[in-house]
Amino acid sequence: IDLLIKDIPHTLPASEEYLLSGMGEFTDFDSVFDALSDAELKFEPVLENGEKKELTHATYSAFMRSPNADVRLMAHKNMHKKFGEFNLTLTKNYLNRLKYSNYVSKTYKYANNFVRALEGEEVTEKVYNTLIGAVHSHFADFYRFAELKRQKLNLEKMRVCDFYANSFTEKAKTITYEEAQQIVKEALKCLGNDYQKLLERAFAERWIDVFPTENKSSGAYSYSTGVSHPYVMLNFAGTTEDASTLAHELGHAMHSHYSETTQPEPKQQYVIFVAEVASTVNEMLLARYKLKMAKTKIEKQAIAESLLQNFYATVFRQTMFAEFEKQINQKIADSEALAPEDLNAAYEQLLKQYFGSKVELHEYAKFEWSRIPHFYRPFYVYKYATGFVSAIAISQKIVDDQTG
């Protein structure tokens, strides 16, 4: 009822709603990006051990974890160089997406797209700004982490492509999908028998599309249909991090299943702001399980490093993305004319600010913004960061058998 009351000032006459509803077919900027990024862009191969290896969205993460610094740099450059070749196309598509979102927001009598997105999640601007401010206040800690990482990797200079490299060779092993299933089940036993049975169902009934295939969307997602069980899409490549991805996406799927089977239909939907908590709690429980099962000091160090890398990827980077998104959306709301160079410069400035003067950027790093699919879901990425921080606290309470 409260939400309905809040929506009253933003409700349009039926005739206007009808006109807006018909625009979706002509404003599908997301699918244009997906077609270009996932199907049409072909990246230069990466030279590894004297052999040319295919670079795709699915293999990119493995290259970023390579122990060979030259391989990491080549993969990072080749990926972003190709996106740079389509900089104008991608800029126009993204800006048109933002212009459309801002137009719809103003039509619904919101000040801009930022306000509409946050109100839809029942989140205040203070939460968003506090996240950015908190990360800014800990830049010095991140710079110290970067320096420690450089020393462990024995690099003369830390580069933007080196943060996913593993300092401990024991961590670089590969796992099968069946092994990942078993690890996830063991790690999530603390969630109870019902949860375990549901995991077994998901595996046995093949809720999960596991492996990468040609023209398949990159990344990992969970989909709720409302009429059947949820579906999960992975691009499993056999890294230990893929087990974390499996746990994460199953967190979304279980959340959807429980909501749809226990709540009346009007209450089944949940805001994304809390969705990322359910998924990331699973990741944290998996990490705690792996720490508990580690037998040697170096194993524990490797797992701790993995947690720090997850924090880097989920809190640090996603907050940087969130700040970029806010900057560009504000310029759109202010009707500023923007060119590719403006977006590239804004992103490069944030890279320099977040990574500091001692981390080396290459000439194609500034194009990274244009390959982030979540930017086509306005003001989504900050929820990864808030979800991660919340999940750390919640997972600790679960392990300690506390309530709250």
Regions found by a protein language model. Name each.
Residues 1-170:
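A well-structured
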Residues 2-10, 28, 122, 151, ...:
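C-terminal, non-catalytic "cap/extension" segments appended to globular domains
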Residues 109, 237-259, 276-279, 284, ...:
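Active-site recognition of the HExxH zinc-binding catalytic motif
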Residues 152-190, 196-197, 255, 308-314, ...:
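Long, K/E/R/D-enriched contiguous segments that form extended
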Residues 172-177, 183, 190, 225-247:
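Short pre-active-site segment immediately N-terminal to the catalytic Zn-binding motif
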Residues 173-175, 208-228:
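Catalytic zinc-binding patch centered on the HExxH motif and its immediate surroundings
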Residues 190-197, 223, 252, 256-264, ...:
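Conserved helix-loop functional segments at active or binding sites
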Residues 269-299, 307-309, 313, 387:
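Post-HExxH zinc-binding segment in Zn-dependent metallohydrolases
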